Amino acid sequence: MSTTLLRTIQLNQFSLLGTSLLRRRRSNNFSVRSCGSQTTTTHEAKQSSPTRVAPKNHKSNQLDEILRDYEAVIGIETHVQLSTLTKAFCSCSNNYGSYPNTSICPVCMGLPGALPVLNSKVVEFGVRLGLALNCDLSLKSKFDRKQYFYPDLPKGYQISQFDIPIASGGYVDVDIPLEFGGGHRRFGITRVHMEEDAGKLLHSDTGDYSQVDLNRAGVPLLEIVSEPDMRSGIEAAEYACEMQRIARYLGVSNGNMQEGSLRCDVNISIRPIGQAEFGTKVEIKNLNAFSAISRAIDFEISRQALLYNQGKADQIVTETRLWEEGAQKTVTMRKKEGLADYRYFPEPDLPEVILTQEYVDSIRASLPELPEAKRRRYEAMGLGMQDVLFLANDVSVAEYFDAVIGKGAEVKLAANWIMSDIAAYLKNEKLSINDIKLTPQELAELIAAIKDGTISGKIGKEILFELLAKGGTVKGMIKAKDLVQITDPAEIEKMVIQVVSENPKQLEQYRSGKTKLQGYFAGQVMKMSKGKANPGLLNKILLEKLNAKD
């Protein structure tokens, strides 16, 4: 029957599978969430009177008192979808957003007789990520079959790694932003293993039917399993952010959560302060943003702590819960499966993965500077932590900044220009730094022109926005528009005398105590000079004339 079902999908590219397995009662329906240009699915299970521990964005004083008695223990499973050209075990293209069921073949559809062939790029990316996370690599690893049934899993099993992952025993260092208390954290990495993704179910708004898209089936993933080292929603969210940064720095994934390229499942339990034994672990899914990770964890901590405090700890069960963004709460999805339910056994159609030390060393030598090393380097340059976190957050911004200072620009000035005016321009125009016309060389030239007094800061900003939009050279624009700053004291003094003599009323008011009128006079001189008068020299001469005794 399954063969017939899957052949139907191949013939009809977006076939509706009208089987009872894909139908859902209204009490156990599937909701559809729009995420960017893609429709993704979330499961909403039957839930009777879910507990709402705290109103949105508010915790009562009573709950705060309860929370002081408990400690959260949090771990995260992060699925990183790899940016390979083809899928993990077949030659189908790995293109996000393709028309449904157009990137499929007998291998990723699980048809009889079709055999998988490992994409070597998946192994390379696994080694790169394992090294970046300070893991020990397995020079000999293998694939296993993780068996379970779900309509988007055509083979009836997932090719994964069970007891011998490609990497294990690592750690990652994370800097917590200053607004959340700051500080440095180190979180352990249990393992990194290779596996394939499942397909995707798209459900009707009514829940009466579901559609299957197998384009994603067989797309390569790396799953990163952390140690249960996190203790708050903020720590967990920052850990997930760091996973995204590392994946992007390495070039193994675009890490776009809205496309499903980075997916996080959170495991959380709480225990009374001082207790060594872990509490009952609950998994949370449907976390589509880093802020959602933090909010979902904070809610779940509150929910479990309240149950503990009420003597209802037995109601905290091992289960999978969903985060409902609209309601700002978690709800039960299903009872959590154990390892035995998956009936792992070695994948018979794939050989062992054998790595040589020479291969590992060559990949290690090709690793770029990673976010943690970049942050420490920027810190050593004298930048504040806020600047460090901003610049190192995006690999493209970091590369641009490095290129600017590589052209001789002063570190702090370059950071200020990128973080203020350029960042504002990018936000307003909805662009990335790779889209702008201003090259690092020209930004360095602009900073130098302001610093050496060739142009004023005000003129510099005007030039900046034109260069961002249209490109060009700083020297060429200064020459073409006659923007060279006036630094001749005699010329500035002449303009000051003229402005003061033309405004006797304002001069009298200034000398009567309204000293704020200095700005008025300075503005008039700037207007006369078309913004080219040196501000420092102008203010010095202006004060002399305004305070002179006639």
Curated annotation (Swiss-Prot):
Subcellular location, record wording: Mitochondrion; Plastid, Chloroplast
Keyword terms: ATP-binding, Chloroplast, Ligase, Mitochondrion, Nucleotide-binding, Plastid, Protein biosynthesis
Disulfide bridge partners, by residue number: none
InterPro entries: Asn/Gln-tRNA_amidoTrfase_suB/E (IPR017959), Asn/Gln-tRNA_Trfase_suB/E_cat (IPR006075), Asn/Gln_amidotransferase (IPR018027), Asn/Gln_tRNA_amidoTrase-B-like (IPR003789), GatB (IPR004413), GatB_Yqey_C_2 (IPR023168), Gln-tRNA_amidoTrfase_suB_CS (IPR017958), Gln_synth/guanido_kin_cat_dom (IPR014746)
Keyword Transcription applies: no
Pfam families according to UniProt: GatB_N, GatB_Yqey
Reactions catalysed according to its record: L-glutamyl-tRNA(Gln) + L-glutamine + ATP + H2O = L-glutaminyl-tRNA(Gln) + L-glutamate + ADP + phosphate + H(+)
Entry GO MF terms: ATP binding; glutaminyl-tRNA synthase (glutamine-hydrolyzing) activity
GO biological process: glutaminyl-tRNAGln biosynthesis via transamidation; mitochondrial translation; oxoacid metabolic process
Enzyme's top EC category: ligase
Region entry Disordered, spans: 32-60
Enzyme Commission number: 6.3.5.-
Biased composition (Polar residues): 35-51
Tree of life domain: Eukaryota
GO cellular component: chloroplast; chloroplast stroma; glutamyl-tRNA(Gln) amidotransferase complex; mitochondrion
Family: Belongs to the GatB/GatE family. GatB subfamily.
Subunit structure: Subunit of the heterotrimeric GatCAB amidotransferase (AdT) complex, composed of A, B and C subunits.
HAMAP family per the UniProt record, alphabetical: GatB
Additional detail: This protein may be expected to contain an N-terminal transit peptide but none has been predicted.
Role this protein plays: Allows the formation of correctly charged Gln-tRNA(Gln) through the transamidation of misacylated Glu-tRNA(Gln) in chloroplasts and mitochondria. The reaction takes place in the presence of glutamine and ATP through an activated gamma-phospho-Glu-tRNA(Gln).
Protein name in UniProt: Glutamyl-tRNA(Gln) amidotransferase subunit B, chloroplastic/mitochondrial
Gene name of this polypeptide: GATB
